[in-house]
C-alpha cells in the first residue's frame, strides 16, 4: 500500500503557529547549507507544505534534478527525474513578491494548482515568473545565497541535470519564538 504522505504532512503541520513562531527550513546540501526564510504572510499554504514535508523527512537525500545557469535550481522530486511529487497538490498563492536571486518558489505544470513538493530557487532576477509561480520564501543570508549560486555554476547535461550530483543530505525546520 502506498504511503499517505498527505496525512503524514497534515499531522506534521498540526503544531505550526505562524502567530507565535518564525520558521525557516535548512537544507544541508553536498555543497553547503542553505537556510530559507519563509513568507507565511503571502503564501501560508505553501509555507505549511514545505514545513510539513521537511518534518517528515521528504527532502532528505533528494537531488537537484534540474539546474539552469543564470536562471534556477530545482529540487523536490522523489524519483530525481522532475516527474514525481508527494502524491497530492496544493492551490496556487500567486503574490506580488518578485523572483530574484535567492527566491524560493514552487514548480508546477501548466495547471496553476498542480504544485506539490518540487520547488526552485532563483539564481537571478526572473521577471517572467512574477505572479505566475508562487513565491514563498528566500535565502535567509548571504552564505546561503552563495551556496545556491555555487549549485548554479555546475556543469549539466542537455536535460539540465547536473553532471556532478548535488543533493540535500538532510533538511530540518528551524523554529524561533516571536
Predicted regions and their residues:
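Cyclophilin-like peptidyl-prolyl cis-trans isomerases
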Residues: 1-178
Amino acid at each position: 500500500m502506498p504511503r499517505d504522505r498527505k496525512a503524514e504532512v497534515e499531522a506534521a503541520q498540526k503544531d505550526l503557529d505562524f502567530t507565535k513562531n518564525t520558521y525557516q527550513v535548512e537544507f544541508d546540501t553536498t555543497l553547503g547549507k542553505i537556510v530559507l526564510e519563509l513568507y507565511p504572510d503571502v503564501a501560508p499554504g505553501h509555507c505549511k507544505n514545505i514545513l510539513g514535508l521537511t518534518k517528515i523527512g521528504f527532502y532528505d537525500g533528494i537531488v537537484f534534478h534540474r539546474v539552469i545557469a543564470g536562471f534556477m535550481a530545482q529540487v523536490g522530486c522523489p524519483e530525481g527525474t522532475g516527474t514525481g511529487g508527494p502524491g497530492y497538490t496544493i492551490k496556487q498563492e500567486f503574490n506580488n513578491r518578485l523572483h530574484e536571486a535567492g527566491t524560493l518558489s514552487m514548480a508546477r505544470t501548466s495547471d496553476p494548482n498542480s504544485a506539490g513538493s518540487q520547488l526552485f530557487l532563483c539564481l537571478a532576477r526572473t521577471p517572467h515568473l512574477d505572479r505566475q509561480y508562487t513565491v514563498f520564501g528566500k535565502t535567509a543570508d548571504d552564505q546561503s545565497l552563495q551556496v545556491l549560486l555555487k549549485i548554479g555554476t555546475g556543469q549539466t547535461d542537455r536535460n539540465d541535470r547536473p553532471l556532478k550530483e548535488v543533493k540535500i543530505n538532510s533538511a530540518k525546520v528551524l523554529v524561533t519564538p516571536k
